[in-house]
């Protein structure tokens, strides 16, 4: 592999796409649209409900697996997730590698009454106002993609608009950076975005070092209830699930199975 990582390549494309969108809709205009949007929902309250929360993802493709599912109606899928008991709906909006779009975000926001997460590679303030303009209540900030001053600035801007940031980490050093930035929700991704390799032990190594007031989200590697319970035992407050749901054949039931497991009396409870 060359010195450029998969993450570097994705971000290069994202920067070009953001510049193209900003050439059509200016930063000032997107800020006005964000101000006009309905106020964001309370993500923290949703994630602090009893049991292990399920963040269910509308995900068409990924760099590691290619096309995953032909999602003709993202609104219908999101409604199925909500009916199954999901706490939050995650929507991929990155186009080049994940085949997502802001149109998907719009469709999902209009279809559900629970919080919606914009999952993308956020590298510029424009994208934060854009997320709010399209109805997002939460967005993803990837520590590996941002230097510390930019991470802190983007997190502050996200929260200034009333949204919640899911701050994603893959190493102990990145977790320290997330905490230094003031993250209140930290996602531990088992997948290394620089190589796309998956190591499900990453969560159990990082989560114990996070303060009890931080919401801990396990990302990647959830294929069924056994994985959810394993993450719960390691201290997860919530799991983010995409591929396992969109390829399940029955997304509503797949979410419901996870929700049932996560709220069962035998499910390990996060230490608080």
Swiss-Prot record:
Pathway: Amino-acid biosynthesis; L-tryptophan biosynthesis; L-tryptophan from chorismate: step 4/5. Its EC number is 4.1.1.48. It is an enzyme of class 4 (lyase). GO terms for molecular function: indole-3-glycerol-phosphate synthase activity; phosphoribosylanthranilate isomerase activity. PROSITE patterns: IGPS. GO terms for biological process: L-tryptophan biosynthetic process. It catalyses: 1-(2-carboxyphenylamino)-1-deoxy-D-ribulose 5-phosphate + H(+) = (1S,2R)-1-C-(indol-3-yl)glycerol 3-phosphate + CO2 + H2O. Keywords: Amino-acid biosynthesis, Aromatic amino acid biosynthesis, Decarboxylase, Lyase, Tryptophan biosynthesis. PANTHER family: INDOLE-3-GLYCEROL-PHOSPHATE SYNTHASE, TRYPTOPHAN BIOSYNTHESIS PROTEIN. NCBIfam families: PRK00278.1-1, PRK00278.2-4. Belongs to the TrpC family. This is Indole-3-glycerol phosphate synthase. The gene is trpC.
